[in-house]
Regions:
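Structural beta-alpha unit
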Residues: 1-17, 21, 92-127
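Intrinsically disordered or low-complexity boundary/linker segments at protein termini
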Residues: 1-37, 152-161
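Acidic, proline/glycine-rich short linear motifs
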Residues: 2-16, 58-85
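Small/aliphatic-rich secondary-structure junction motif
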Residues: 16-70, 95
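General small-molecule cofactor/ligand-binding pocket signal
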Residues: 55-57, 102-106, 158
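Short secondary-structure boundary segments
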Residues: 59, 130-132, 161
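Short, hinge-like loop/turn segments at secondary-structure boundaries
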Residues: 71-75, 120-122, 145-146
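Glycine-rich, Arg-bearing micro-motifs that act as flexible, cationic patches
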Residues: 126-152
């Protein structure tokens, strides 16, 4: 177990003090995009510095497809295999720096709601996420996952370009 790290907190700039770090559990919403990979690197650095652990949460968008499309299960299985390989790569990096990491994969249609639900039920102290993901133009029409998460989250959110 890493030694307890200190963090500076301030009521205002004239009233600052060092206390035990409140960063214990960092969530990285992850889609294997370059943005989420960079977010993971920031989370890894913070976890190492503060003695926190990381949960990497991948919520693969469950498309509502017509029932006549037979190959959705095959597509979902391929997505799952790709994400499992990514999780292995992230776990290896965390192990190298002695950071505890957990991975979780969900197949859902409500991405932001599932991120927020996970945060609330798992004592997450910080979310580190990319400013963009793999969503493309369709996701832009419905709003940014990063923006919605940062506006609704009960904890600090770090957005990484």
């Amino acid at each position: 177990m890493p030694e307890t790290k200190l963090q500076i907190i301030c009521r205002d700039l004239d009233d600052c003090k060092e206390v035990d770090s409140t960063i214990k559990h960092i969530l990285v919403p992850y889609d294997d995009s370059p943005y989420s990979n960079r977010a993971f690197v920031y989370a890894l650095d913070l976890a190492k510095k503060y003695g926190a652990h990381i949960t990497v949460l991948s919520i693969m968008y469950a498309h509502e497809l017509p029932t006549h499309i037979q190959h959705q299960t095959v597509i979902d299985n391929e997505k799952r295999k790709v994400m499992e390989k990514s999780f292995k790569r992230l776990s290896d990096a965390a192990k190298k720096f002695e950071v505890i990491i957990n991975t979780k994969m969900l197949m859902e249609s409500e991405i932001v709601d599932n991120i927020l639900s996970f945060v609330s039920s798992n004592n997450v102290n910080l979310i580190v996420m990319g400013t963009r993901g793999r969503g493309g133009p369709v996701r832009l029409m419905f709003g940014s996952v990063a923006m919605a998460t940062s506006q609704k989250a009960p904890c600090p959110v770090m957005l990484v370009k």
